Structures are given as C-alpha cells and as structure tokens.
Regions:
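Acyl-thioester C-C bond-transforming condensing/cleaving domain
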Residues: 1-2, 16-46, 61-65, 72-159
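A residue-level signal for beta-strand positions that form part of recognition/binding surfaces
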Residues: 3-4, 51
C-alpha cells in the first residue's frame, strides 16, 4: 500500500451560533478553504486534484446537499474534479480525511483535497410530509441540532 501524506492544512473560521458568520453559506466557507489551499501551494496544479472529499454534518438546504462539489466549483477547480460529501455528524471531517487516505493507499488516486466544513446557524427548517395528499398535519423542525424526523421505533428503543 502507498503511504499517504498531509501536505498542508487550514481550517475554516470558528464562529458562534448566530454570530458573525451567520450569513455565510457553507459552500462559500468550503470554497474559501479550497482556494486558500490552492493559492498557498502553487506547485500543485488544479488539474492534479483527483477528488475533493468534505465532511458536513448538516448538508441540506441552500448548499444543494453536495457541499464538496459546490465548494470546489466555487473555488475555481475544474468541473472534471468530482466532489463527495460525507455525513457522519460530528466526525464528518475526520471521516473525509480518512476516506481520502484510504483511496490514496489503495492506489486509486494520488492527490485528494479533504476536510470538513459546517455552519450550524445556516441549517434549514424542514417540513415533514403529510399523511395524505393536501393533508394539514405537516410538522416543522429546525435541522440545526438534534433529531428531526424521529422514527418512533428508535425513539421507543433509545428515546
């Protein structure tokens, strides 16, 4: 197996819920990090990036669910670079880095950009399906924290 190396690291800014970053989209945060990494490493051409794997615990709403893909396009990477978003809640970013390492170790790629990005303030409100067409029993949930659409069986087992 190949040995993997982390050649550079940068992190997104850390904010507070409802704070200074509240109006910043998640894909824009991801693009900022990708663009900054590419600018700091001019010896790595954009075309050398074989994949972008980003973790995100709440990929729903305005960011189109695939934050990695949207972020890499916003950062100016070629449209031929694929993007994969990993959702393992709090361990999403670490899982993305581990997945990238595995892909390189197995020889499927040489250069992968991996990490994580999140903005919990931007988590959307979500509405449940109704029990029948045009029903009036929809429920609304804040998707920022906690369970959203709780499966009653899981609630009975662990709730």
């Amino acid at each position: 197996m190949k040995t993997t190396y982390i050649i550079d690291a940068i992190r997104t800014p850390i904010g507070n819920f409802g704070g200074a970053l509240a109006t910043t989209r998640v894909d824009d945060l991801g693009a900022l990090v990708i663009k900054t990494l590419m600018d700091r490493n001019p010896n790595i051409p954009k075309e050398a990036i074989e994949d972008v794997i980003l973790g995100c615990a709440n990929p729903a709403g305005e960011d189109n669910r695939n934050i990695a893909r949207m972020s890499l396009l916003l950062a100016g990477l070629p449209y031929t670079v694929p993007g994969e978003t990993v959702n393992r809640l709090c361990a999403s970013g670490m899982s993305a880095i581990i997945n990238a390492s595995r892909v390189i170790q197995l020889g499927d790629a040489d250069v992968i950009l991996a990490g994580g990005v999140e903005n919990m303030t931007r988590g959307p409100w979500v509405i449940s399906k109704t029990s029948k067409p045009f029903g009036r029993d929809a429920q609304m949930f804040d998707s920022s924290f906690g369970w959203r659409f709780v499966n009653k069986k899981i609630d009975a087992m662990y709730g």
